[in-house]
């Protein structure tokens, strides 16, 4: 995956909503690139959507209609203390249709320190395995964060699927 998308440039991540007026680096510090859905990357979209469908069919039974965005390839650099504070992947306007979020752990856990993906639910907080290749799917309304990376480089893929309003 890394080699396949290497020609796509990274840029500094933005956030969709910043109602509190926080400076961006207080909320998130990472670099991203968007992997287009095309003939080259179609296999990746198909595979990730299979994971989403399996998780949804077994756990939530949401009405999913489509992938809502391109796949986000994210880098958190230890020399920048890269992180993404507590947030939800839903919000106003187009973000209102997100129902499931998917994260793929691309980095080997020995390549970085810190950078835990933590998810909060009614059952408390859970830290996701750092094992390379781990795929986690969760409802987009759950609070989650990536703790500061204190060394090395953490890389991941993120994808969202959605549909009409919850019923």
Segments from the language model and where they lie:
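Fe(II)/2-oxoglutarate oxygenase catalytic core
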Residues: 1-135, 141-167
